[in-house]
Amino acid sequence: MSISDDISPVPPAPVSEPNAGQDAGQDAAPAHMAARAEALRDQLNYHSHRYYVLDDAEISDAEYDALFRELQDIEAEWPSLRTPDSPTHRVGDTVVAALETQAHTLRMYSLDNAFSAEEWDGFIQRMLRAEPDAPTAFWCDPKMDGLALEVIYENGVFTTALTRGDGEKGEIVTTAMRTVRNLPLRLHGEGPHPARLEVRGEVVITRAEFDALNAARRGAGEKLFANPRNAAAGSVRQLDASVTAGRPLRFLAYGVGQVVWPAETSDGAASAAQGPEARWATHGQVMAALADYGFGTPPDARRCETPAQVMAYYEDLGRRRSELPFDIDGVVAKLDDLSAQAALGYTARAPRWAIALKFPAHQATTRLEHIAIQVGRTGVLTPVAELAPVAVGGVTVSRATLHNEDEIRAKDLRVGDMVVVQRAGDVIPEVVRPLVDQRPASGLPEFEFPAECPVCHTPVRREPGEAAWRCVNVGCPAVVRQSIIHFVSKAGLDIQGVGRRWVELLVDRGKVTSPADLFGLDKQTLLAFERMGPKLAENFIAAFDTARTGATLNRLICALGIRHVGEQTARTLAAHFADLDALGAAQAETLQQLPDIGPEVAASIRAFFANEGNRALLERLRGVGLWPVRPVRPEADAAGAPGEGSGPLAGLRVLFTGSLTTLTRSDAERRAVAAGANILGSVSKKLDLLVVGDKPGSKLDKATKLGIRVLREQEFLDLLEGRGGDVPEDGDGAPGNEDEAPEVSADVPAAPEVLADAPAAISADASSGVAPGVSGGPDRADMTDRTVRTDSVDAPAMPRKKDQHSLL
């Protein structure tokens, strides 16, 4: 099946035979050999384009290989003839030491999402309010589920490839992308080409090629990829380009970034204009030009003249999504008129002229075989459904979080039930409901939540008003393991290069039983581990030293994992207490005088410092020199200065709860602070505004009882952008009450394969202190198993009601 509109590039002239008897020892390549190399490059690039982009090969593989080997031989004899656009770069003979980053010239924005027809209508209305005369024709294409990437061309030659990264800067993956067969190394077609062209798109793998890739890995005894997206991402981010070259990757272009045109056009007229709109009027024209330049483009893309046609396209594509060669999770609709795009501009995170219309979640039916219990770093016991493996939207799902006991009771889930499973937002596995009519006539027993921790067998406790049961033993092996992982994480001390798997390995081997042990590790101890080389061991020790000497008080407070104390509360505490001695001596009454600390948080802080084991840990940290005495520097943490400025949330005290779909919790808090808000850590009468995501839990109940105003996530974003008017009255727009979401969330498909020195995944055993069938905490790679190809369920028409956002 062709993956782009059929275009017919003019084939290069046939390659002539070389002259016999040429002296290969000359330093300078003879002119006729240089001409031959150029002809070979043109011929190979032409046939690669016909094969990989147009699916219309003109020569056999053997003929192509003969031309390719001939060019390799010429370049080996005369290296000066190897040009940047030579097809021989695609063999991937380069290894880079590490992936460096580079800033994008123009930011790569995210897209806002629409999950219902009403949200699509709301997007249109917001757009027309901002620009009443904007045309409403849209360019629509499938939302490819791959790795977003930017490829850069200077004077028609490919020079740089960057991952999307955080939108501001991305990782440089130029060497790997040179091996992607359908990516033009030199722009095709007649000029003039842009002097600089930034092309944006997705790196994808077809489902058929993904199945073949996993079959080969299975035969070789290698770990299987979870899904095509993870395979694509892991392949592009390889340090060894020869690995990338062996993967069936394709780059599909969906737009452009910066475009700089030559100073003069082909007819000699001066042209100082820059940007795509200097030569193209519509996005459709941009896509046609990219196809002419030699790029593959998303299949089934089209122009829709009205918003109603967009919805018809969305519903049609949803019904046919299983017929497409690639995984997709929705439709991207972009205003087709480029001048209207420029007039509408961007919000802080997304264009105002484009949106992603997401498909409803895939669903499937399977059996609930067991309910296992995970123990997290604060002792939370999280039930996890162990399922008979089932294909859901192209991924085999065998586990899904059940959040807490109340959710099990509310859904009446029982071991042995046939259940409906979905991937919310096509990503997060979720058990939707049991099929009660399929239970045996004799019935099934209700699930009994354990009365003791399955790891250390300490009695568990559930506090009034909370949804979670907790192990209260701070020495529980599972709690210790997860606490150390949190200690080194980005939310803790952010110890660079020391990831979750290394911590698990250190704990499992008994080398680390406390965060303080990390700072006593020496090179000899580290070198005893497989795949730990001298340089990596030195990097680890240097990272621990940097954390020990450079940690700020607020980071250490957060790293300690005090219950209810997150990043913002840690900043508040660090700004008011000189060191941990002063904080530990503070009485509850003193703590409650601080801006975001109520009785519950104050009691938790007091309980932490009263615990004998915690006091022993603090003394050990003091002994290794990890004892910051300075408050967080305002210039180093500007986001921590709450309540300042004149933004839309100026002076308001805000709290977030539930699972946010478009932002991380940290990003949401930073944006709220930038808008003038003060972030609180718990619900109290001091709170002005509660922002709720999915499964907001008991915080919503408390806020409702206290008459605190509530906003949905999208309403919060609208308010930040000046689109939402005033903060709504009490409870307006709040979703239905749900139990407190536990700290262990539903897991997503396995992360891309490890790129640098890192150990293989560590399985739980007796040495880890984790009971059989029980995890010492969430391993996001475990929730979704290996991918199998499956035909997806036809997507129904988008519902006409205002649904809560699914997790992405």
Swiss-Prot record:
Residue stretches of biased makeup (Basic and acidic residues): 779-792
Every BRCT domain range: 644-733
A Pfam family that the UniProt record links to this protein: HHH_2
Protein name per its UniProtKB record: DNA ligase
Active site (UniProt): 143
HAMAP family xref list: DNA_ligase_A
Cofactors that this protein relies on: Mg(2+); Mn(2+)
GO biological-process terms attached to the record: DNA repair; DNA replication
Residue positions binding Zn(2+): 453, 456, 471, 476
Organism whose genome encodes this protein: Nitratidesulfovibrio vulgaris (strain DSM 19637 / Miyazaki F) (Desulfovibrio vulgaris)
